[in-house]
C-alpha cells in the first residue's frame, strides 16, 4: 500500500489563521484521507495521517458517523465514507 502524505492540522493551524472553525477543518481533513488507495481506515492510522491524538480523531469520527459522513464496519474495525456524501458528490 502506498504512502499518503497530508499536512497535519497542527502544522496548518500553527501560524496561519483562516478564521475558520478548527473542528470543521479537522473533520474535513479526515474525510480527505479517504480515496481509491485508502478506502477504509482504522482510528490509529487516521490519527497518524493527520497528526492528531487518537481520542480527538475518535470524537471527530463519531460526529461524522452520526451524520452518515462516515460508516463503521464492525467486522473489519474500519471506517469508510458514508452515504451522506453521495448526494453531495453528484451535484
Residue positions per predicted region:
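N-terminal helix-turn-helix
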Residues: 2-91
Amino acid at each position: 500500500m502506498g504512502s499518503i502524505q497530508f499536512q497535519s492540522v497542527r502544522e496548518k493551524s500553527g501560524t496561519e489563521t483562516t478564521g475558520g472553525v478548527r473542528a470543521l477543518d479537522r473533520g474535513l481533513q479526515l474525510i480527505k484521507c479517504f480515496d481509491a488507495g485508502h478506502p477504509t481506515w482504522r482510528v490509529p492510522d487516521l490519527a497518524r495521517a493527520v497528526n492528531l491524538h487518537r481520542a480527538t480523531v475518535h470524537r471527530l469520527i463519531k460526529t461524522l458517523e452520526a451524520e452518515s459522513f462516515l460508516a463503521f464496519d464492525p467486522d473489519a474495525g474500519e471506517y469508510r465514507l458514508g452515504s451522506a456524501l453521495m448526494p453531495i458528490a453528484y451535484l
